[in-house]
Amino acid sequence: MSEQKTLSVQKRDNLGKGANRRLRSEEVVPGVFYDTKGNNVAVQMPAKPLQKLFEEVGRTTVFQLEIEEEGKKSTHPVLIWDALFHPYKKKFTHIDFFGVDLDREIKIRVPLEFVGTSRGVKLGGKLEVYREFIDVMSKPLTLPKKITLDLTELDINSTIMLKDVAMPEGVRPATNENFAILSVLTPKSE
């Protein structure tokens, strides 16, 4: 397994809308770290290292959050839990980090990646996607970044159900419900 990435942040004392606006004008992103015991710490970090880390780890890869407070540093394994972006500048406006216990399963939403063109679509069928994400249970270090589904063998009137999805080792669906992920539908007649 590759070494985990680290993001350095500082504890933030000035809270509120005005303080957060001042931070953002200085290319600093406000955020909150929620630890495994339910406590939270207001933090701030430079925007560029955060953007770079987010591009590398996304929302399903554990990394180390190094919090500096009054000259002392503490490190915590975390996931990015929620991220808010400016509507058109594609810049972070706020971010939440979720501390994880590496030995306990967590529930997280993982994106699905669809590859290949199905036989049914080549014959004129219509691909209807019902889910682009699925919720899974896994220990934090075995979370997949995405789950890939190969569509090449799907014929017209075929459906991929949750039970048909091959999960990576150590990963299971977060629900017992069996729902449709996608279907190749019969083409409509003119």
Curated annotation (Swiss-Prot):
Alphabetical keyword list: Ribonucleoprotein, Ribosomal protein, RNA-binding, rRNA-binding
GO biological process: translation
Superkingdom of the organism of origin: Bacteria
Residues covered by region (Disordered): 1-20
Any one GO molecular function term: 5S rRNA binding
Gene Ontology CC annotation, any one: cytosolic large ribosomal subunit
Family under the similarity heading: Belongs to the bacterial ribosomal protein bL25 family. CTC subfamily.
PANTHER family: RIBOSOMAL PROTEIN L25/GLN-TRNA SYNTHETASE, ANTI-CODON-BINDING DOMAIN-CONTAINING PROTEIN, RIBOSOMAL PROTEIN L25_GLN-TRNA SYNTHETASE, ANTI-CODON-BINDING DOMAIN-CONTAINING PROTEIN
Biological function: This is one of the proteins that binds to the 5S RNA in the ribosome where it forms part of the central protuberance.
Oligomer and partners: Part of the 50S ribosomal subunit; part of the 5S rRNA/L5/L18/L25 subcomplex. Contacts the 5S rRNA. Binds to the 5S rRNA independently of L5 and L18.
Protein name: Large ribosomal subunit protein bL25
Species annotation: Nitratidesulfovibrio vulgaris (strain ATCC 29579 / DSM 644 / CCUG 34227 / NCIMB 8303 / VKM B-1760 / Hildenborough) (Desulfovibrio vulgaris)
Lineage per the UniProt record: Bacteria, Pseudomonadati, Thermodesulfobacteriota, Desulfovibrionia, Desulfovibrionales
Gene of this entry: rplY
